[in-house]
Amino acid sequence: MKVELNGVEVETTETGFLVNLEDWNEDIAKVIAAQEEIELTDKHWDVINYLRDEFINNKENQPNTRNMIKDIGKIWGEKIDSKSLFDLFPGNPSKQAGRIGGLPESR
């Protein structure tokens, strides 16, 4: 599989995750999100950037949905539940946001 942006193809796995983390940028994220029928809002970007920060700066940590609820709630300054994240990323928040964020597929 590949993602194309401005005539340049970026390689992905069979499940749509980027092969190389370094290939990611916000424009690639928008292309992947469009393929997933997601229009990115500031809240989407908060989740994507949180996951990227955890992976890049915290020993390749890929938080599960439970940890995401706790941490994203702190970022937003409000109590949230899993529905809040599934409303943003209906295909599974950690996997779908990770895919859009250019991260490897989580276990």
Regions found by a protein language model. Give the residues of each.
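N-terminal first-folded block
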Residues: 4-34
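Charged, low-complexity surface patches
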Residues: 22, 61, 86-87
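Helix-rich interaction surfaces within compact, conserved domain-sized segments
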Residues: 12, 69-107
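Short linear functional motifs in flexible/disordered or boundary regions
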Residues: 28, 59-60, 84, 97
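Metallocofactor- and cofactor-centric catalytic cores in central/energy metabolism, strongly enriched
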Residues: 19, 29, 33-58, 65, ...
